[in-house]
From Swiss-Prot:
It comes from Thermus thermophilus (strain ATCC BAA-163 / DSM 7039 / HB27). Its main location: cytoplasm. Homodimer. It catalyses: (R)-pantothenate + ATP = (R)-4'-phosphopantothenate + ADP + H(+). This is Type III pantothenate kinase.
Length: 252
């Protein structure tokens, strides 16, 4: 029984695996101000709510060190198991970038998750929608080749609302048409259709440089963009959690 935890800048995903089956999945707000005791209460309540058995092991991927520290302590105190934080060496990947230490844990774990899918060319492009959107190029059997980082769609929408006097906050749903007839539809066109064009363009450029690849989309915005991005071969919102499971099973 593995508790897999993906700590992102905006939200934290938690998945409980029994063998290779994901039996429970939660998402909570990432709060840098929460203490270990608060995370312990949250975890206790979530497990009680679903009547879940305690994990036998825990593995964390994190891009937020303060939250990582408190979450690790909370898991260890509540369940009495060691909560390991994934390092690059744990992934078994050959990280072929200028400074391998710069590669985010979530991106490397995504790469491990992607490699579980069959790819006709042995290459993968992973698109992860979060606070930032990342594009990563991966090659079988275990090579991480680099990628690109862009602003996340919700981050872009929040920035527009915060830094302009008259533009409102909106929900990121696809518009009826590219040519908006009011401010809300114009914003949705720019933020949703514009973002789809960004994704399609980046994937095309990756393929021009590296060759054909299996494109896997993950993160909260992936499902919204699925009908707008024909470049997606797979949408897997649990890719990071599955990558953590694979590391746990293969590396111990």
């Amino acid at each position: 029984m593995l508790l897999a935890v993906d700590i992102g800048n905006t939200s934290t995903a938690l998945g409980l695996f029994s063998g290779e089956e994901l039996i429970a999945h939660f998402r909570i707000h990432t709060d840098r101000m929460r203490m270990e005791s608060e995370y312990r209460v949250i975890l206790k309540n979530l497990f009680a709510l679903e009547d879940l058995p305690p994990p036998k092991a825990a593995l964390l991927a994190s891009v937020v060190p303060p939250v990582e520290r408190e979450m690790k302590r909370a898991i260890e105190r509540l369940f009495g198991v060691e909560a390991r934080v994934v390092e690059a060496a744990d992934t078994g990947l050959e990280v072929l970038i200028d400074n391998p230490r710069e590669a985010g844990a979530d991106r490397l774990v995504n790469a491990v998750g992607a490699l579980a899918y069959p790819s006709p060319t042995g290459r993968y492009i992973v698109v992860d929608f979060g606070t930032a959107t990342t594009f990563d190029l991966v090659e079988a059997p275990n090579r991480y080749l680099g990628g690109a980082i862009a602003i996340g769609p919700q981050t872009a929408a929040d920035a527009l609302a915060q830094r302009t006097a008259k533009l409102p906050r909106i929900d990121l749903t696809p518009p009826k048409a590219a040519v908006g007839k009011n401010t809300l539809e114009a914003l949705r066109s720019g933020l949703v259709l514009g973002y789809a064009a960004l994704v399609e363009g980046m994937v095309r450029r990756f393929k021009e440089e590296a060759g054909e690849a299996l494109v896997i989309a993950t993160g909260g915005f992936a499902e919204t963009l699925r009908p707008l991005c024909p470049c997606f071969d797979v949408v897997d919102e649990d890719l990071t959690l599955k990558g953590l499971l694979r590391i746990h099973l293969e590396r111990g």
